[in-house]
A protein has these predicted regions:
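Solvent-exposed loop/turn and edge beta-strand elements of beta-rich ligand-binding domains
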Residues: 1-314
Length: 314
């Protein structure tokens, strides 16, 4: 009868940690290098430091993703509880802890929905905490046999918010005779000229105008350049996924009683505005106004932009 062999492996469970950067809106990996993380060992109460030997030997405590949107620690970690802290997000994304969401009442509007509704409020997310033991789900690298524990860390896309204001000179007061009286006075002048008499009292009208909000003006917002999905995703032909082609209509804005119109959740990029309806008693403004939404850094969840139009009265 053959002997039964049992192999016991008493070596401690050690693993390589793989962090995958994801776009929280599309669910796709972010195919950009540069997301940076620190890994805090909550049991030892210290940050993980590891040694790399290429291109030169050095000790690192910040780990960075590659162009495929992930990183693998160069050395193995032991079983413990770890907190993953993002210290830099890739271009076009909000660093973990600085998120904001667009709310309509209690409902969160998806950042992918371009809309004139909602108010932005802080909605920061906690860092990822993972406890790893020998029972933790893991992968085995087919080439090296190394144990790999994978975690996904999503980021919100940075967005823009445009506020457009429209003003123009509008009559607020008429000094002197009423409009009816003015008409009668003009008729009187004509009569005087016919009969050869002068009955003009010398009273005249002074119209007073003030610059104020224009309601009902309509504008169209277009993409000035092609705007791509910030996650770097590609279509079946290998081309970058496009959100808006150059000169695509992105939104239509109509000013309210305060002369304002807002559009939220615009992808970062360059745009231009055209006025299509001037509002009552105003001349259409032919000026095309351009602007670019660019975040100052990865802590800016929303880039705010203001554009003002002024129209001449008819």
């Amino acid at each position: 009868e053959p002997m039964v062999w049992r192999v016991f492996d008493d070596r401690p469970f050690e693993f390589l940690l793989k962090i995958v950067k994801k776009d929280a809106q599309t669910g796709n990996p972010v195919l950009k290098a540069g997301a940076s993380y620190k890994i805090f060992d909550m049991e030892k109460e210290e940050y993980v430091e590891q040694t790399v030997f290429y291109p030169k030997k050095e000790t690192i405590s910040v780990f960075k993703t590659n162009e495929e949107g992930y990183l693998v620690t160069p050395e193995e970690l032991k079983c413990s509880t770890y907190r993953i802290e993002e210290v830099k997000a890739p271009e076009g994304f909000v660093r973990q802890g600085y998120e904001m969401s667009l709310y309509e009442g209690e409902t969160v509007i998806s950042p992918l929905e371009v809309t004139g509704k909602g108010i932005y409020k802080e909605n920061s997310k906690e860092g990822i905490v993972i406890t790893v033991s020998s029972d933790t789900a893991h992968q085995i690298d087919p080439d090296t046999g190394a144990v790999i524990v994978e975690v996904e860390q999503p980021n919100d896309e940075q967005v823009g918010s445009l506020t457009l204001t429209k003003t123009g000179e509008q009559s607020v007061e008429v000094k002197g005779d009423s409009l009816l009286a003015k008409a009668k006075r003009l008729a009187g002048k004509i009569k005087d000229a016919v009969i050869g008499e002068d009955t003009d009292t010398g009273v005249f009208h002074d119209f007073v105008y003030e610059e104020s909000a224009v309601e009902g003006a309509t504008f169209e917002l277009y993409a000035k350049d092609t705007i791509y999905s910030p996650d770097g995703a590609k279509d079946e032909q290998g081309n970058p996924v496009i959100r808006y082609e150059k000169d695509d209509l992105v939104a239509t804005l109509v000013t309210d009683t305060e002369g304002k119109a807002v559009v939220n959740n615009l992808p970062l990029g360059s745009y231009y505005l055209k006025e299509t309806v001037a509002g009552d008693h105003f001349v259409l403004n032919p000026e095309q106004k351009e602007f670019t939404l660019t975040a100052k850094d990865d802590t800016q969840a929303v880039v705010y932009e203001g554009v003002a139009y002024k129209n001449e009265r008819q």
